[in-house]
Amino acid sequence: MSTLDTPLVVAGKTYHSRLMVGTGKYQDLEETQNAIQASGAEIVTIAIRRSNIGQNPGEPNLLDVISPHCYTLLPNTAGCYNAKEAVRTCRLARELLDGHSLVKLEVLGDEKTLFPDLVETYQAAEVLIKEDFQVMVYTNDDPIAAKRLEEMGCVAVMPLAAPIGSGLGIRNPYNILEIVQNATVPILVDAGVGTASDAAVAMELGCDGVLMNTAIAGAQNPILMASAMKKAVEAGRDAYLAGRIPRRRYASASSPLEGTFF
């Protein structure tokens, strides 16, 4: 972290890494563990409906390689298509993780696009917040929707950059920038990152962090890609803090003409 920077704070807890990672799509638990270590991430998200964190005693337990003592676990509601399913999944996560209250809410609209269903997302967020969950919420890149979720009490808003798993990168940087500039909670790009340059762009826009899974797990060398993403997030953040030069239509000479010898 740059000496010019301040740590990321989510739900009152401080983090030095602004890269958050998922646990799906890896070949095995060993690769999962090694990639997460290479990423330097401190927040690791887990799909409760697809991962074993103790509910299936006879199967490999993800918590054997991702200890709650080393990482902040972020249970998510991936695979939920209505508010009722999402709320039930968060309650299960709280039970399995001994009262853990930080969750990532995502309520999907359909299986083709995996875009969020905002009506169901609002309903689920309202219930979860009333039940004292700390909700980090997946949403689209609509600035109005993002602000509404913030005002409801979500502790972080996570707009998509592009469809989940698409690797298309930041499709609408202007909307992401608008969300960032109007927010008072952390804005974390979630979904659509494909390579290191995408992560850097998200950070250069002023996002507080980036969450990704497929971009690392689906790479030909996940461990190396995890390391690349770590560096990209750090470089993008430093570039944002440094302040880029303005874009110009015409050239601007690097060396002044005044004081030349001939």
UniProtKB/Swiss-Prot annotation:
Gene Ontology cellular-component terms listed:
cytoplasm
Q: Which reaction does it catalyse?
A: [ThiS sulfur-carrier protein]-C-terminal-Gly-aminoethanethioate + 2-iminoacetate + 1-deoxy-D-xylulose 5-phosphate = [ThiS sulfur-carrier protein]-C-terminal Gly-Gly + 2-[(2R,5Z)-2-carboxy-4-methylthiazol-5(2H)-ylidene]ethyl phosphate + 2 H2O + H(+)
Q: In which pathway does it act?
A: Cofactor biosynthesis; thiamine diphosphate biosynthesis
Name any one GO molecular function.
thiazole synthase activity
Q: Where does 1-deoxy-D-xylulose 5-phosphate bind?
A: G165, A191, G192, N213, T214
User: Where along the chain is the active site annotated?
Assistant: K104
Subunit architecture: Homotetramer. Forms heterodimers with either ThiH or ThiS.
- What protein name applies here? Thiazole synthase
